[in-house]
Structures are given as structure tokens and as C-alpha cells.
Amino acid sequence: MTAVLLLPKTAVKANPGIPLAVFAGLAVLVPILSQRGQVVALSLAALATVILHLRDRRALWPALRDSRFLRVAVAYVAWCLLSATWALDRQMALVQAGQLLGALLAFTLVLPVVTELTSRERRLVGMGCVGGILIGVLTLAIDGYGGMPLQSLLRHGDPHPPVHMLNKALVTISLMVWPAALHLWQLGRRACAALLLCIVVAVVVPQESSTATLALSVGIVAALLARLTGRFALWAIGLSVVAGALATPYLVEPVRQWFTVHMDLSSWWSAHHRLYIWSFVLERMSERPWLGWGLEASRAMPDFGWAIWPGQDRMIPLHPHNEFLQVWLELGPFGLALILIALIVPLRVAMSYSWGQRMFVAGAWAATTAAMVPGYGAGQTWWLFTVMGLALLYRAVLIPEEDDA
């Protein structure tokens, strides 16, 4: 019976690194072509990777069983499903919980596969990462500085496509540059790794996305801190994010009042709008402080007693633009604790890496958490798949080394 369930072994050795390399090569281009294409791309890559892994009769369950992330993921999905019983919109909550379950299932199946890739397979994925960044740089430069001809074509000849159409790709390249730079670093091409980061900075910073600029800047600072202080940097950035998430309810209103007095609304419209949303979220959090309002409640949150921001049709447009506050609002402090634990796991694992690998872990991790604060919603599938793709590519590229610090 067991033999029937095994995929046939052929003379040609399966290479599970190929689907990941293809995904890496398209990771920045896909968000430019399709707003939700990242979900399809990573799903297909994950499925093909697992099939090729099993085709070569490599073990899957032992590594999956020992996954630290799996335990936290199961607890988080279970809490999301439970929260649907008191959610404002149960159907929407169950749909979102199902999407989250599928995404995390794909991630936890592929994660043990990428940890067992051979050095040759890892180099192949690394080449895909570098190629993907170069393709992304070229495409973003053409669209960003050339009048957006590609976006105009995709929008059926629209002569003036909105600039924000590139924002998702800009954020994606700000994250995906880290595994690409790590690959070059591990090959001994450290100058090339630094040059690649500089090229991405030159493309991202002058463009429209403040979230991408913030993520890239914070990531570079964290990487430099890790270079100078070693493991201390991992502890420092991890504790700072936990402390910042827990202190947010006490900081939002003073910061909003300071912004109102000192920062011009026309120049800082986006920041004023986010702070206004966060103040509203904190008021609603205080009404259900322990269990939260239920998964996906942000989309249906009652806005009585508050004036709608000019140009908006509701207080929270899709999400609160702060993932920590969104999780706290919807899932309460227990949900927030699970998210923070899930974020700390990769930093804890990275303590055993070499100093160079720790440096790039710090950069990728800090860039991701920085983008979580002003950027996207916890329930946006494209963002969830982008973060999971980053984690998988980083782990696939990383070549185990002896700790040297």
C-alpha cells in the first residue's frame, strides 16, 4: 500500500530548486503585471517544489513534525477560526480563515523542503533571486522614470495610469533584494552584494512608495547594526519590535497631537490619515479588550461618533494600515502574542548562523516588520504570500556554515 502512494523514482534526479528559482526570477515582475499574481506564482512554485522533493523520495514529515513555526501557525489559525464565532461578519471571517489556512499549509509543507536543498540547488535559487532583482530593477526603472508605458499597456492604453500601481512591486523588491544579496555574499562577491543593494535604493527611494523606502532604509540600518554588534542586533531589533507593538496604544494619541500642531496636513496627508485611523482603532479596541472583534472585523467596524476622513467612504479603508493594531483589534492580545512569537522564531533560529548570514537576516526581518506598520493589512493575501515567499527564498539560498562569531 505504501509503495502505491510513493511517486515513481526515475533515472533523472529531481531538482526541487527549479520551481523556487523560477518564482524568485519573477517575484518582482509579477506584482507589476498582476496585483494578485504573487498568490498564484508562489502556490504553483510550492506545489511543484513538494512534488519534485517527494519524487526523489526525500523525507518530508520528520522535518515538518519538528518545525517550530508549525506549532505557532496551528495555534494562530485555530484562534482565527474560533474568533469567527463572535466576528461582525462570520462569513467573511470564515473565508479569510480558510485562505489563511491554505497559505500557511503551503508554507509549512515547503519549509522543510528548502532546508534540505543541496548546495547546487541553493545556488540555483540564488541565481534566480539575483536575476529577479535585475529584472525588477529594469522594469521599475522603465515604468517609474519613463512615463509608465508598461502600466499604460496593461490598463488598455490609459495614458496616465496612477503612480501607486507600482507600490506593491516597489515593496516587493525592497524585501526580495535581501536573499539575492545573501547569495552574492556567500559566493564571496561582497562588493556585488553591496552594489545590488545600492541599485535597488537608487530605484526605490525616488519613487512614490513611502512604505518601500521605509522598509529598505530600516533593513539597511538593521543589517549594519548586525555587522557591528553580531547577535546583539538580533536581540535588539526583536525586542524593539515587541516593545513597540505593545506600546503603540500609549503612543498614537500623543504623536497624532504633535503631528496636528507641527506637521502640515497637505505635505503629510498620508501620515495624518493613518494616525487618525489608529486613534479610531484604539477606541474600538478598548470596547473589546480581551477577545477582539473577530477576524476581518476591520472591514465592518462601526464608525459611529467619528467624522469620516475627507475623500474616504468609511473610517477604515479595507485595513488599519498597521498589522499589529489590526491583529490586536480583531484577535485581541492573544492573537497579537502569537504574531509576535511567529516573528521572533526566525531571529531565534538565526542565532546559530554565521555573522554574514545574521546580517542579512537582520536586514530582511527588519524590512518586513517595518513594512507591516504603515503599509498593508494582515489579511491581504498578496502581502501574506510575499512575506512567505521571502522567508522561503531566504532559507533556500542560505548555505549552512560553521558559526564564526
Please provide the spans of the model-predicted regions.
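Alpha-helical transmembrane segments of multi-pass inner-membrane proteins
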Residues: 121-154, 161-227, 345
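Transmembrane alpha-helices of multi-pass inner-membrane enzymes
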Residues: 45-50, 342, 361-373, 377-405
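Long extracytoplasmic/lumenal interhelical loops at the membrane interface
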Residues: 265-279, 287, 291-331
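Transmembrane signal-anchor hairpin modules in multi-pass inner-membrane enzymes, especially those
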Residues: 1-92, 115-123, 127, 183-190, ...
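Hydrophobic transmembrane alpha-helices and their immediate junctions
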Residues: 330-368
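Aromatic-anchored transmembrane helix interface
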Residues: 69-76, 90-113, 124-128, 133, ...
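Membrane-interface alpha helices of multi-pass inner-membrane proteins
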Residues: 25-31, 77, 194-208, 220, ...
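A membrane-periplasm/extracellular boundary helix in multi-pass inner-membrane enzymes
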Residues: 138-141, 224-267, 282-287, 295
